[in-house]
Amino acid sequence: MAHPKRKTGKSRRDKRRTHYKATLPQIALDPTTGEYHLYHRAHWYEGKLYYKGKVITDKTSVGEV
């Protein structure tokens, strides 16, 4: 197994870790329903699955088929 030959200093360690940062998720507002959702994701609203403002699936019609 590999072992470090020298101790990694606090400064070097912290410089490396500066690139790991927490980011807020981007939230979009659906123009059709007015609901907030994540970008590039479908979302449920009143039993219907919406994507880009259009109905993809309706929960009530799935059981009738």
UniProtKB/Swiss-Prot annotation:
One of its GO terms (molecular function) is structural constituent of ribosome. GO terms for cellular component: large ribosomal subunit. Residues 1-26 are annotated as: Disordered. One of its GO terms (biological process) is translation. Belongs to the bacterial ribosomal protein bL32 family. It comes from Azobacteroides pseudotrichonymphae genomovar. CFP2. Residues 1-20 have a biased composition (Basic residues). Pfam families: Ribosomal_L32p. Keywords: Ribonucleoprotein, Ribosomal protein. InterPro entries: Ribosomal_bL32, Ribosomal_bL32_bact, Ribosomal_zn-bd. The gene is rpmF. This is Large ribosomal subunit protein bL32.
